Every structure is written in structure tokens, then in C-alpha cells.
């Protein structure tokens, strides 16, 4: 019993409550100063995981829309590419040549989009599962 009381006394201090899976909780960051501007994605169906490209544009996985979107940071416009049926892109990254690689969470693939040509290719994941980022 004395050991338990000693342990509880050693652990005494402020208790933390709340939180999130992403490590950011309300009030955790200092006040952000400046102007925030938002642009709605043309297909607002679970747009997620934005990633910058080497051209300065932002690429976005539109999971439920089965598309990849690009936001042109100069013209402030969007372009979208359809993906193979059921791909449901979960996440993406853009390589140094500007090729977009995405995980096809819905059809068990790793996909490749060349934004210059619009060509999309996909490869079955060895596990056959639902790949994530």
C-alpha cells in the first residue's frame, strides 16, 4: 500500500485531457497572424493530404471523388484528373520530376499520374490490401 501511495505521489501533477490523433489540440499553437485565404476544391469529396510539387503547385488526393486535384499557386485555379475506377486515393506525394504518386486505397494499387500528359498508370500492391500513405 505504501508503495502505491508513493507511486501516486510521484505521478501527482497537472492532468492533461483532450487531444487528437494528429498532435494538435485547441490552443496548442500560438495565435497565427496574417490573412488566411481558402479556395474550395472543385470536387469537395474528402479532399486530403495536400502535397507541394517542384513547380510550387499543390496536389491533393480527392478520395471519395476518385481524383487528383492540382491547385496552381500562380493562377489560383484548379485542374483535376480522374483515376481508375475505385482507386479512392488515400494520400500522395510528388517527386522531383513532378510525377504524382498516390495510394489507391480502394483498389489496392500504387498509382502514378504525369500531370504534363494526364497519363495515369497503376500497379497492384503486393499485399493486395488497401494501401495508405
Show the residue positions of the predicted features.
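Sec-dependent signal peptide recognition
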Residues: 2-8
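Hydrophobic h-region of N-terminal signal peptides that target proteins for export
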Residues: 8-17
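A short helix->beta-strand "capping" segment at the edge of beta-propeller domains
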Residues: 23-45
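Hydrophobic/aromatic beta-strand positions that recur at structurally equivalent sites within the blades
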Residues: 29, 68-71, 110-113
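A short beta-strand motif characteristic of beta-propeller blades
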Residues: 37-40, 77-82, 119-124
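Beta-rich, blade/repeat-based domains predominating
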Residues: 42-55, 85-99, 128-133
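Conserved beta-strand positions in repeat-built beta-propeller and related beta-rich domains
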Residues: 58-64, 100-106
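Short loop/turn segments that connect beta-strands within beta-propeller blades
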Residues: 72-76, 114-118
